[in-house]
């Protein structure tokens, strides 16, 4: 039984599309996951350099529908399946697919998207395991290699770039957005000792949270506050995802000298009468630092392949856990019922404990069977137990397509 075969991914990155196209498709996928996610497990990773949608057990019709949504904005998108889809996600988490090799921002963005989509119920079952393992790979790569030494991500590169024009130690700086990139920018700017730092976010609580960690001042992300920052600050960094420009004019008497646009799509209007730094301006700097990390990248690639080899066993273990979870829950429920009939809390607890002690060794054996490649046998046995204890008959989530 190949538990990776139901995995598929639709991939679009900075190599195939510009920031504006990625932004539009990212918004499209945000709506799409709310339609597909409740029916089919789905995970969407949208950053300034990529929009990637992963599905588990999707029908060809669902996959085609997803691709068509991409094609509303670009000519084509890559489709990856099975182990190749997992390999790509592992490489993304490791920073091997980034403009800046080994950047750490992507790992934070991956975890942020994962947490949000698990809470929403979209990323679940065996897809959840795949994404969890990708996060594990990302952390392992950064712990065991030196691939992330130096600039942590595009935010770090943009700070290096801006420091060519502005003395940051004497500058007032504003960061628009308090997500993974914005928070990273704030942390590094604070470490560099900027004269004054402001954090703006649509949710003031999130801005306050970042501000407390960095000694900054939190403000709401409103048009009035953005204009105020342009008047007061020397540098403004924009790291927000929006379909509208957050900066579309420079007010008279503004102090701002440089605006950095890390938004996807672009969040700063073209043609402004000041220096605007775009993602494309950072490409040369990214190449320079990436070249220094190539030896460490080889070590990271080896880790990716090692973890990829272990993925089938992890999926098998999770598949059996899902299959027996309902059995265990139903058995405990029956034990509690019998205990209540006895009219004694002690009897109820004893019945429940006895059932768990009887079933747990069986559950562990089923997991071992799955890990040793006998997934189908383990699932067959678990389904026999399902019928015996009277739980609703059926295969575990997302396995009906795996034959």
UniProtKB/Swiss-Prot annotation:
Binding site for NADP(+): 177-182
Lineage of the organism: Archaea, Thermoproteota, Thermoprotei, Thermoproteales, Thermoproteaceae
Family per similarity comment: Belongs to the glutamyl-tRNA reductase family.
Enzyme kind, highest EC tier: oxidoreductase
GO BP: protoporphyrinogen IX biosynthetic process from glutamate
Gene that produces this protein: hemA2
Note: During catalysis, the active site Cys acts as a nucleophile attacking the alpha-carbonyl group of tRNA-bound glutamate with the formation of a thioester intermediate between enzyme and glutamate, and the concomitant release of tRNA(Glu). The thioester intermediate is finally reduced by direct hydride transfer from NADPH, to form the product GSA.
Protein name: Glutamyl-tRNA reductase 2
Species the sequence originates in: Pyrobaculum arsenaticum (strain DSM 13514 / JCM 11321 / PZ6)
Documented EC number(s): 1.2.1.70
PROSITE patterns for the chain: GLUTR (PS00747)
